[in-house]
A protein has these predicted regions:
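ABC-type ATPase nucleotide-binding domains, specifically the catalytic core motifs of the NBD
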Residues: 18-38, 51, 146
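Conserved ABC ATPase "signature" region
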Residues: 38-55, 164-165
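Conserved ABC ATPase signature
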Residues: 60-64, 68
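Conserved catalytic motifs of ABC-family nucleotide-binding domains
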Residues: 81
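Catalytic Walker B motif of ABC-type/P-loop ATPase nucleotide-binding domains
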Residues: 85-88
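P-loop NTP-binding/switch modules centered on Walker-like glycine-rich loops
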Residues: 90, 94, 98-176
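Charged, flexible cofactor/metal-binding loops and thiol motifs
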Residues: 146-225
Length: 226
């Protein structure tokens, strides 16, 4: 109940035979927090919070755009008044203009309701602009943790740097070719001794092949496993 989720593709996370009223109120009904006769008013309340008209309560998922569906998904997530909401690539399936409005809505709700938001995302530019803290993962391992506003300037791990170099920016030098990482990616299920990034790291040493680095503090709110 205290942890909720906003999925990447809301259309596949909704029951296509359920109206928005039931989609939003289903978690509340499951926990016995509201009565059936209260569903309409409750659904309208949360639709207003995500900036959708109240008459959307009678719509089915296929009657809405992708952005509208995602707003309903957010309404469902906040209905239980959780402490934290995880957003799994919650804007990647949307148009850029719609992405911006959804992110602005999430940030607004986070401030109003004092909830924590956890973004699972590959878009470093977006993450660095809104996240207070960023954890960079490689093959299921956290390799670096640092403040969002310092990602582009203070990243230290070779993988974090490689990610940043792969992001197109209008200020980048297009005369320089993008250098892909060398080496093979290990299978996610395979056991590997040492650093998980060793096969693709230009700075790999013998120690990297023998010992798995642990996260260590290297600066203010900055941890590195290298």
């Amino acid at each position: 109940r205290n942890v909720q989720m906003v999925f990447q593709n809301p259309a596949t996370s909704f029951n296509p035979k359920m109206k928005v009223r039931d989609i939003i109120c289903e978690p509340l009904m499951n926990f016995g927090l509201i009565k059936k006769k209260e569903k309409d008013a409750i659904a309208r309340k949360y639709l207003e919070m995500v900036e959708l008209p109240g008459d959307f309560v009678d719509r089915y998922p296929h009657n809405m755009s992708g952005g509208q569906q995602q707003r309903v998904g957010i309404a469902r997530a906040i209905a239980l008044e959780p402490e934290i909401i995880f957003c799994d690539e919650s804007t990647s399936a949307l148009d850029v203009s719609v992405q911006k409005t959804i992110l602005e809505l999430l940030v607004k709700l986070q401030k109003e309701k004092q909830i924590a938001l956890g973004f699972i995302c590959h878009d470093l530019a977006m993450i660095s602009s809104i996240a207070h803290q960023v954890a960079v993962m490689y093959m299921g391992n956290i390799v670096e943790i640092l403040p969002g506003e310092k990602v582009t300037e203070e990243a230290m791990h070779p993988y974090t740097k490689a990610l940043l170099q792969s992001v197109f920016d209008i200020h980048m030098d297009f005369s320089k070719p993008i250098e892909p990482l060398e080496g093979e990616v290990n299978g996610a299920t395979g056991e590997q001794k040492g650093c998980p990034f060793q096969n693709r790291c230009a700075y790999c040493m013998k120690k990297c092949q023998e010992e798995k680095p642990e996260l260590k503090t290297v600066g203010e709110k900055h941890e590195l496993a290298c």
